[in-house]
Amino acid sequence: MNIPLGEKVMLDIVAMFRQYSGDDGRMDMPGLVNLMKENFPNFLSGCEKSDMDYLSNALEKKDDNKDKKVNYSEFLSLLGDITIDHHKIMHGVAPCSGGSQ
């Protein structure tokens, strides 16, 4: 069966989240750190954000219910931020500069 690219990307995102989340379907800080370092090393190094403070802040910002874990919806919000930053870079904005596009 030929899976269209968009569907494959979505299925891969779901699988990535499940790989790093716990049995409760949520991801704690160690899981988020591992996921980011293993799957987004260029983003982290390009933004010079590979330190724990950035990841702690990302978890805190996206943790809407303040349970110190990221559910799937919160995780998608984080991925949205990363995707927006990559889009800005494609339009000549410096990585993580906060510029608009």
Curated annotation (Swiss-Prot):
The keyword Repeat applies. PROSITE patterns: EF_HAND_1, EF_HAND_2. Residues 13-48, 50-85 form the EF-hand domain. Gene3D superfamilies: EF-hand. One of its GO terms (biological process) is endothelial cell migration. The keyword Metal-binding applies. Zn(2+) binds at H87, H91. GO terms for molecular function: calcium ion binding; calcium-dependent protein binding. One of its GO terms (cellular component) is cytoplasm. It comes from the Eukaryota. InterPro entries: EF-hand-dom_pair (IPR011992), EF_Hand_1_Ca_BS (IPR018247), EF_hand_dom (IPR002048). Keywords: Calcium, Metal-binding, Repeat, Zinc. Ca(2+) binds at D63, N65, D67, K69, E74. Belongs to the S-100 family. This is Protein S100-A7-like 2. It comes from Homo sapiens (Human).
